[in-house]
């Protein structure tokens, strides 16, 4: 069996702010905490990193800062999605230029391309930049769902190496494992179902929860990847309430509240994301107690 290019837990990093600006010192500290906690990679400027409200300059700077801070200790998969193919190519090209190990490219949102349009989008990126690409399929946010048939076609392209699957459809993992080739990387994009996803052959998760609990998430994934399902299930039971609580309000507000409570960064977000509600805060704190974080 071939080892996948990426595996384990890769936190979908928040982008901390202070007084409306990216807090670079806090971001560096968060990256160092993740690496010390044993995570297997880093994913800056994705959904949880509020990429939608970063300027292009900020987006590029956060990727550069992540790569510089990681210093090759773990791989960096840079968020580089856009509903404009030309813009996505530019973001992927920048990720390659600054030394990222791969790019995470979300399916084009809002303009709702056909399945053939989705294939053409990723084919164009594949042809333009020599950097490994992970397809990010999250239809609840994009209103498009890339089909297994298109993914099989994409798996034949040299630079499209795998997927972040946030559909919660576990059968997709089995299908892709059987039809996309043994080098195809399969990462869940949904913490609560990652255990089942890995049981179907997935290799890990791009995780929101790891922002708050890197050591615990790393232990969970190490157990699952080694086939110790009993220990992995114990970790699942300990973390599942936190998985849910971090989406008790619009993400990443609950995650930033949790990090603020731990003294790691401000809970500041950018509009239209507002701070977590009092009910969400209470739910997050209860979940953090369950997980042994406070």
UniProtKB/Swiss-Prot annotation:
Sites annotated Part of a proton relay during catalysis: 47, 110
Recorded GO CC terms: cytosol
Keyword Glycosyltransferase annotated: no
Subcellular location: Cytoplasm
Protein's pathway: Amino-acid biosynthesis; L-lysine biosynthesis via DAP pathway; (S)-tetrahydrodipicolinate from L-aspartate: step 3/4
SUPFAM superfamilies: Aldolase
One of the GO BP terms on file: lysine biosynthetic process via diaminopimelate
Keywords: Amino-acid biosynthesis, Cytoplasm, Diaminopimelate biosynthesis, Lyase, Lysine biosynthesis, Schiff base
The reaction(s) this protein catalyses: L-aspartate 4-semialdehyde + pyruvate = (2S,4S)-4-hydroxy-2,3,4,5-tetrahydrodipicolinate + H2O + H(+)
Assigned EC number: 4.3.3.7
An example molecular function term from Gene Ontology annotations: 4-hydroxy-tetrahydrodipicolinate synthase activity
Domain of life: Bacteria
InterPro entries recorded: Aldolase_TIM, DapA, DapA-like, Schiff_base-form_aldolases_AS, Schiff_base-form_aldolases_CS
Active site residues according to the UniProt entry: 136 (proton donor/acceptor), 164 (schiff-base intermediate with substrate)
Segments crossing the lipid bilayer: none
UniProt: pyruvate binding residues: 48, 206
Entry's family note: Belongs to the DapA family.
Role noted for this protein: Catalyzes the condensation of (S)-aspartate-beta-semialdehyde [(S)-ASA] and pyruvate to 4-hydroxy-tetrahydrodipicolinate (HTPA).
Subunit architecture: Homotetramer; dimer of dimers.
PANTHER family with a match to the protein in the record: 4-HYDROXY-2-OXOGLUTARATE ALDOLASE, MITOCHONDRIAL, DIHYDRODIPICOLINATE SYNTHASE
Name of the protein described by the UniProt record: 4-hydroxy-tetrahydrodipicolinate synthase
Organism field: Phenylobacterium zucineum (strain HLK1)
